[in-house]
Regions:
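Core of compact, soluble alpha-helical bundle domains
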Residues: 1-135
């Protein structure tokens, strides 16, 4: 259910738009030389992953509350992730958002993606420092 005060509501974002963005973006990710190998090694149920990420973005922009996961531990457990991967992820995501969404919707998706990436990078850095200290 979409919350009327959700940031995506006034920008015309729909569940169909979110699923289209997720599908188009992850098709690019899977074909990407930088990101593809990491995702292919970790994701074994792509349909389930796409559904989970659709729920994630629905919760972010429509406040649907459908996503119940914890992305930080999942990403922190992948030692290969580096700043280069976040830069590439943001580039592909931004390009895809601009291709499949109207401008106001694309802006919101890109803004939230940047905030999420910064949060994940900070959390991963803390996790890695703690792991190095414990060793």
């Amino acid at each position: 259910m979409t919350h009327p005060k959700a940031p995506g509501f006034s920008r015309g974002i729909t569940e169909t738009m979110i699923r289209g963005l997720v599908d188009a973006f992850y098709a690019k990710v899977r074909a990407d030389a930088v990101l593809g190998p990491i995702f292919e090694a970790k994701i074994h149920d792509w349909e389930g992953h796409l559904a989970k990420l659709t729920d994630f973005w629905s919760s972010i922009v429509l406040m649907s509350g459908r996503y119940k996961g914890r992305p930080m531990p999942v990403h922190a457990a992948i030692p290969e992730i580096s700043n280069e991967h976040f830069v590439r992820w943001l580039k592909l995501f931004g390009d895809t958002a601009e291709e499949v969404c109207p401008p106001q919707a694309a802006f919101l998706f890109k803004d939230r993606a940047m905030r999420i990436a910064e949060s994940l990078k900070a959390g991963i850095a803390i996790h890695r420092r703690a792991a190095a200290t414990a060793s």
